[in-house]
Each structure stands twice: as C-alpha cells, then as structure tokens.
Amino acid sequence: MIALCWNCRGLGNPRSVGVLRECVQRWDPKVVFLSEKKKNITGMKRVKVKLDFVNGFYVQRKGKGWGLAMFWRKEINLEIKSYSKHRIDAVITEEATGFKWRITGFYGHLETH
C-alpha cells in the first residue's frame, strides 16, 4: 500500500493542486496526508474531489494555523482514532486478512530539551 504525505505550504495556488494531482496520478496512493494546507474544510473537500478520493478527514486551521487533512480510497477500511492540531492518527484494517496497521500523519517542529 502506498501513502503520500505532503507539506503543502498552502493550496491556494491552482498550480499546487495540479502538482499534487500529478503525484496522486503517478503513484496512486491509497491514503494521502496533507499538512500546511491553508484551506478551510469546504476548500479541502473540493481538493479531495479533484484528486478522486471518496473519504476525507480534516483538522480545521485555527487563526493563522495551517490545518491538516487525510484522504483515503473507497476500498480502504480506515478509522480515525485521534487527532489534534498537529496530527491525525488512524488504523487501517486489511479486508482479506483482518490485519491492522496504524498510520499517523503529523506536522510540527522539532523540540529539543
């Protein structure tokens, strides 16, 4: 299974959406995680449709925050387990075997202590 993670740095530019669509067409990922999307949920639903995905989960940006999104194909059995402004955590169950695996998309800066 292929998953695509992309730091968008904003999807306001139509060219950015076009490049993302080219990546999706080329690699045919079953799951896509986007960070720094800079779009509201309505805008991200449009992007999801342009990328030919059926399912999506969105973490709305707060103020000048960036926001997150995860899209997955119709045939993928994905359940969101938890989320925050920095991550989306999910479990995928494979239909044929019942095998479960975790996928977590996250965005943030490295903190040193």
Ranges and model annotations:
Residues 1-113:
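A shared catalytic/ligand-binding motif for oxyanion handling
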